[in-house]
């Protein structure tokens, strides 16, 4: 038989971790984007890299950030359900 339950406080801490790290990834993306825009770098390699950044790397970071937000929201939903079940 499956066990159901969880430590409410720990779930809250887990959600906070997902939220915090989501903001970290968002800030990391912003910092790299800004520095890439202001870095003196020209030529075909620079163009290829900037294209890869905007087409692949930044997209991957945005997806990671969104996944962390969604994971935090899911933990919050489960935490709420456990609180309601215990009431």
Feature annotation, model-predicted:
Residues 1-87:
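N-terminal secretion-targeting helices of virulence/extracellular proteins
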């Amino acid at each position: 038989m499956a066990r159901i339950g969880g430590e409410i406080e720990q779930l809250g801490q887990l959600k906070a971790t997902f939220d915090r790290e989501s903001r970290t990834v968002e800030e990391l993306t912003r910092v790299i984007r800004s520095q890439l825009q202001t870095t003196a770098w020209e030529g075909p390699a620079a163009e290829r890299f900037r294209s890869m950044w905007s087409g692949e790397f930044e997209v991957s970071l945005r997806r990671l950030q969104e996944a962390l937000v969604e994971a935090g929201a899911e933990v919050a939903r489960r935490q709420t359900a456990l609180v309601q079940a215990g009431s």
